[in-house]
Amino acid sequence: QRQHILPSIAHTDATYEEVEKANKAGYTHITHLYSAMSSVTRRNAFRHAGVVEAAYLIDDITVEIIADGIHLPKPLLQFVYKFKGPDKTALCTDAMRGAGMPDGESILGSLTNGQKVIIEDGVAKMPDRSAFAGSVATTDRLVRTMVQLAGIPLTDAIRMMTLTPARILHIDSSKGSLEAGKDADIIIFDNQINVINTISEGHVIYSK
């Protein structure tokens, strides 16, 4: 933590107690909340809380969600927003190379020996369509999803895409908001949250 390294809990079947121990050891973030991680399980007749429950009960844990409207449906997006809030929830694309590309075949991972996937219905799927194989969402889509599907205020959705992740990563001294002395990173979008201009450190790098 002194070196601003962010240890994160992800893709695990850990129990609540194990997450609690990890948190005391310095783990303060959870990657892709709900994706490939434990919730309430039953072991030898007893129920055990998992990573998901720990995310809500341990106050200093921050989370990120793949808010494409597919990995997490509307009720779960609303649940995370209601109980973790915009200051402890970051939006994450988790996008693979199929993002922004037409539907069809793609490869997850290495181009030489990676996993073949199918891009359709706004998400990457395994060839047999038995599971998701990654996201193809862009950041503007995440904001649109939170506003138009989950019904949260635009200002909170933007915060979850900008200042909150910057704070989690300890780079909010230069990123995450428009303030004197910070990098001039600006997105201009229309009423439907479609990107019109992208400005990076004061330079226009995209114009529609």
Task: Map each language-model feature to its residues.
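Histidine/acidic-residue-rich, glycine-tolerant segments that coordinate divalent metal ions
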Residues: Q1-H48, G100, G202
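Residue-level "edge-of-site" marker
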Residues: D13, S35, G69, M160, ...
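Short secondary-structure capping/turn micro-motifs that flank functional sites
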Residues: T15-E17, S38-S39, H71-P73, L163, ...
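Anionic group-transfer/hydrolysis microenvironments
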Residues: Y34, M96, Q192
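Active-site-proximal flexible loops/turns
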Residues: S39, P75, M101, Q192, ...
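His/Asp/Glu-enriched, well-ordered alpha-helical/loop segment
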Residues: R47-I65, G69, L76, Y81-T93, ...
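C-terminal regulatory/interaction regions
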Residues: S174, A180-I193, N197-K208
